[in-house]
Amino acid sequence: MDKDLRSVQEARDLARLGKIAANKIATYTNEQIDKILQSMVKAAKENAVCLAKMAVEETGFGKFEDKTYKNHMASVMLYDSIKDMKTIGIINEDVNQKTMEIAEPMGLLMGIVPSTNPTSTAIFKAMIAIKSRNAIVFSPHPSALKCTLEAVKIVHDAAVEAGAPENIISCISLPSIQATNELMKHKDIALIIATGGPGMVKASYSAGKPALGVGAGNSPAYIERTANIEKAVRNIMASKTFDNGTICASEQSIIVEECNRDAVIAEFKKQGGYFMTSEETSKVCKLLFKDGHTMNAKCVGRSADVIAKAAEISIPEGTRVLIGEQCGVGPDYPLSYEKLTTVLGFYTVKDWHEACELSIELLQNGIGHTMSLHTEDRDIVLKFTQKPAARILVNTGSAQGGTGASTSLMPSFTLGCGTWGGSSTSENVTPLHLINIKRVAYGIKDCDTLASSDITFDYPELKKELRDEKQNGQPSFSLNSNSEGDSDEKMMSLINELIKAMKGAN
């Protein structure tokens, strides 16, 4: 049997076993689930560093210290946020309205894992699946296979040790497009959680199954005139260099005003930003993008030094981010697109009105995802809430802010983009997205007096019809009326006469 056939068979086997596990865990109590989650968190924390190192060594993307923090976010921080979340039994009850909401698991989930955040995504999706009493089977990116398999094994073994069913968390070990497609369309898969490239997310939504997918990011960061420039630049630099820019919520372009342009540039230079010449920008763009604005995978998650050397440009020691000035958006301005690495576009506008227009243009290439602004003016924040972005972050780095590390958003590595970006949700995905909710509703009104007891049910024309019926002694519209039947009989009679006449003529 060749590899593709074996991978397809493996996908089928994992789905079958996962469904059995899903049926078992569906009966677990909150206490049992919490015990399992605590065991998974403990194991993930103990292995956070080694998993991070494995991911960097295997993919070449990012920095192991930041991937360690991602693993920490996906386990320790996530657990703190969801431990008291109601996902089992009665999750809401309104005594006055006599309604109840009952949570039920979805069953077997499929999780797609990207190469940029492999171990943290696997841990995260496993955690939210278990919290909602679901089983999950992963489809890993081939370039991150080993570290993903190890992350899945660690949390699976910890879960089983704490009482979870065998095969509750599993992963394809022979990844192929055929296996992924087989899993997506398998009858036992209830929901697909898709985190990855646009093609994979689109395929998930085309599989004929419910899916939670994410769109591409292209986050602009607007430094408004009232901003604390030093703090704004510090947050942006910390965000863009976090794991070398692999988080899709990270800043992609900086927007400044004419009045603060010089101060912002000076602060970026002070904090390790290098402003490239137009010639250097052109060299970097040719390196970063292939076939239009498709990013060169070899440049994803690389340091500024690595990018500069590959582009054959000289940069000062200590450079953390490469910055290229742009004067437009679109194919002629490559840095106006998403760059999951340590490179930023830089724009200058006259005022907030122009910043609004430019932000909307930039967001078209990552619509629905995230944007950030740095300002002390609340009115400016409210104006920017009209932009097509599901996460509008204020005075924080967008990588950490969007994923919930530096904000009060729910910690998540699956960030919905709403219908703007072709997603079924605009939220950070949590266990609450992975449950079916039954609604129990008691009758609170008598069915036979609904109209008569409703003072707003007042239609004069209806009253007139009822009066006419009463006066005439019969309803205006009766089921016993033969008007339609009489018409039909007359029509058939005419047709028959016409046929006879035609025969006579022959």
Language-model-detected regions and their locations in the chain:
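N-terminal Rossmann-like NAD(P)+-binding subdomain of aldehyde/semialdehyde dehydrogenases
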Residues: 1-100, 128, 270
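Conserved C-terminal structural/oligomerization subdomain of aldehyde/semialdehyde dehydrogenase
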Residues: 26, 313-506
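Flexible, glycine/charged-enriched surface loops at secondary-structure junctions
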Residues: 27-31, 163-169, 244-248, 274-285, ...
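Residue-level signal for inorganic ion chemistry
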Residues: 133, 192, 257, 307, ...
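Structural signal for hydrophobic packing residues in well-ordered secondary-structure cores
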Residues: 19-22, 26-29, 40-48, 52-55, ...
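Rossmann-like NAD(P) dinucleotide-binding subdomain of oxidoreductase/dehydrogenase enzymes
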Residues: 90-231
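ALDH superfamily catalytic-core signature
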Residues: 5-8, 201-330
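Short, flexible turn/loop "capping" segments at secondary-structure junctions
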Residues: 14-16, 213-215, 244-248, 333-340, ...
